[in-house]
Amino acid sequence: MLNRTKKTFHSNILKQDYEYCVLTSDEETEEAYLLHVQDGKDYLELGELENAFQNLLEKQPEIARKLVFILVHPGNSMDRWNAYHHKGKKFKQYLTFMTEEFLPEVEVEIGRKIVRRGLLGDSLAANISLNIAGMSPETWTHLLLQSAAVSEKDIEMVEQLKHVQWLVYQTVGKYEDEYVSLLTNENLYILTRNRELHEMLVKKGARIVYSEQEEKHEWRFWKSDLMNALEFFLFTS
């Protein structure tokens, strides 16, 4: 059985409330494998994350019950772009909010020994996850990046890091260079940028499972790939 608790967090930095969920098994453990999920509502509704979690509990109960998901959602499409894209009005503030307000307080509330700490995101949610990790690289053990909508500037952020020890699961579709943003009408060249990001992460010392699949930039792809990403988080060390 799963426990899903819906909560609200008020940010003094952004002066607004954010809804988030805590998802765990009903068997509490002393240790936690903590996974922070951006686009949390989409992962629940479109990615069917709860089904994937339940499958993991049935297959590997001893380790899967250590999983704790923190699923935060940025709001509507424009809120998301402003928070997750480096050109967004709230991008820098959102990074500060996550690293200085949200993450510390939420993790104290969990009350467990955190032995793994990861970030999961799709598209722009993967981009903000990468940037959150870049704020304090030593804090994170795992990054799960599904079709990360990164720009040259985000790759430059990684280039500025001295060295990382991240374990990275990175997937992208072979047809994603064709994707055009519905908000900005610009081509994001997602496949090309992911190849560049992969090279930079390797250069910086990350250990990576990288794959290009016969897919487009859509939730059907990320949903089908989600179990692989979660198993990487659980079993790769």
Regions found by a protein language model. Name each.
Residues 1-237:
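Non-catalytic cap/lid and distal C-terminal segments of serine-dependent acyl enzymes
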